[in-house]
């Protein structure tokens, strides 16, 4: 009886040892050895371990699994293209735009400085000067090459033509007023004296017969006034003015501006335009100063539409992007390049308790098998 119990215990211990060691060795052989072991040209069986040996296949299968079951287009759609995500993105963008642009005290010049355009006011003024100079040169060229008739519209020409009789009437009225004035009388007297003195002895003889020139002033004055009041005078002057005006309209406008100094005019014009623009002052204001309703417009119109279109476009391109990313190959490369030592450490660290239980289970099963074998041997 004692021999039976000793034999039974001995076989149970041997079975437990074999079962435990076998399971422990099997677990180790999942990862070890990391490389194949050779004796001369003969490779030792079961080297390298299962996972190192099948790492390429494992990498390919993991890549396929990830692409076909884990990171599928539908997974991305559910995760990143849901209505909730879109609303969160929209809210985030609205907040950032409001904080960064519309409620920020930064001026337009500050934004230009950030973008690297710190000399923008001077650059704009130079551009303005160049534009004004170009337009000024264009105007001068137009005045030099085109006639007044071409430059003036038909309506303006008709208006100016109609002003000629009015101008003639005004000139005659002013001439009449002048010759009836004391100053006009003095002018007439001086003209008569100059005329008589220019005729020499003949003039002196006339002066002797007529007496002093003062006696002629009244007569000449009346005749001049009659001449100015006569309808024929107005008609004659109107005709002369009209003829001369028609001749002038066929000449370039620049013919009448030959003596004008254009450089000072250009400089003053450029200065005036720059003063009116006040570029530096205008750029020294925040965006909200010129666009107070911009925040609400961006929030209610631009951002929602932009986000919606961006999500629709991104969802349309999702499958194409995933194909271009080639996630299967990425996973395969990463798994294939991942050190086996790190993988072993990771798996054992996570499943250490389970592996111990497997080892214990092997020992228990080995012990039970040893007991059964002991019983069989005893009965035989």
Curated annotation (Swiss-Prot):
Q: Does the keyword Transmembrane helix apply?
A: yes
Question: What membrane topology term does the record carry?
Answer: Multi-pass membrane protein
Give UniProt keywords alphabetically: Cell membrane, Membrane, Transmembrane, Transmembrane helix
Which InterPro entries does the UniProt record give? DUF445, UCP032178
Show the stretches that span the lipid bilayer. 1-21, 357-377
Give the primary localization class: membrane
Record bears the keyword Transmembrane: yes
Where would you find this protein in the cell?
Cell membrane
- One Pfam family of this protein, by short name? DUF445
Q: Which cellular component terms (GO) are annotated to the entry? A: plasma membrane
What family classification does the UniProt entry report for this protein? Answer: Belongs to the UPF0754 family.
Query: What protein name applies here?
Result: UPF0754 membrane protein Bsph_0374
What organism is recorded for this protein? Lysinibacillus sphaericus (strain C3-41)
């Amino acid at each position: 009886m004692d021999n039976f119990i000793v034999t039974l215990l001995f076989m149970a211990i041997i079975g437990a040892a074999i079962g435990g060691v076998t399971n422990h060795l099997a677990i180790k052989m999942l990862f070890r050895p990391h490389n194949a072991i050779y004796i001369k040209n003969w490779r030792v069986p079961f080297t390298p371990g299962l996972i190192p040996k099948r790492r390429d296949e494992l990498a390919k299968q993991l890549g396929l699994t990830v692409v076909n079951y884990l990171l599928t287009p539908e997974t991305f759609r559910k995760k990143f293209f849901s209505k909730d995500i879109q609303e969160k993105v929209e809210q985030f963008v609205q907040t950032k735009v409001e904080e960064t642009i519309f409620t920020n005290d930064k001026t337009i010049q500050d934004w230009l400085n950030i973008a690297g355009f710190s000399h923008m006011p001077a650059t704009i003024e130079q551009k303005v000067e160049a534009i004004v100079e170009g337009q000024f040169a264009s105007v001068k060229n137009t005045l030099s090459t085109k006639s007044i008739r071409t430059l003036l519209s038909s309506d303006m020409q008709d208006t100016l033509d109609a002003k000629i009789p009015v101008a003639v009437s005004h000139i005659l009225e002013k001439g009449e007023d002048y010759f009836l004035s004391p100053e006009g009388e003095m002018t007439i007297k001086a003209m008569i004296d100059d005329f008589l003195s220019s005729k020499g002895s003949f003039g002196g003889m006339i002066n002797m017969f007529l007496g002093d020139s003062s006696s002629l002033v009244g007569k000449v004055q009346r005749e001049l006034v009659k001449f100015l009041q006569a309808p024929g005078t107005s008609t004659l002057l109107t005709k002369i003015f009209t003829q001369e005006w028609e001749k002038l309209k066929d000449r370039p406008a620049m013919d009448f501006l030959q003596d004008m100094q254009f450089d000072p005019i250009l400089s003053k014009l450029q200065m005036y335009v720059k003063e009116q623009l006040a570029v530096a002052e205008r750029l020294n204001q925040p965006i909200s100063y010129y666009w107070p309703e911009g925040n609400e417009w961006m929030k209610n119109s631009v951002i929602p539409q932009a986000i919606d279109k961006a999500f629709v476009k991104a969802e349309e391109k999702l499958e194409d992007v995933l194909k271009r990313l080639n996630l299967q190959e990425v996973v395969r490369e990463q798994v294939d390049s991942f050190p086996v030592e790190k993988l072993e450490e990771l798996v054992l660290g996570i499943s250490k308790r389970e592996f111990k239980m497997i080892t214990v289970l092997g020992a228990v099963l080995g012990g039970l098998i040893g007991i059964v074998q002991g019983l069989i041997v005893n009965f035989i």
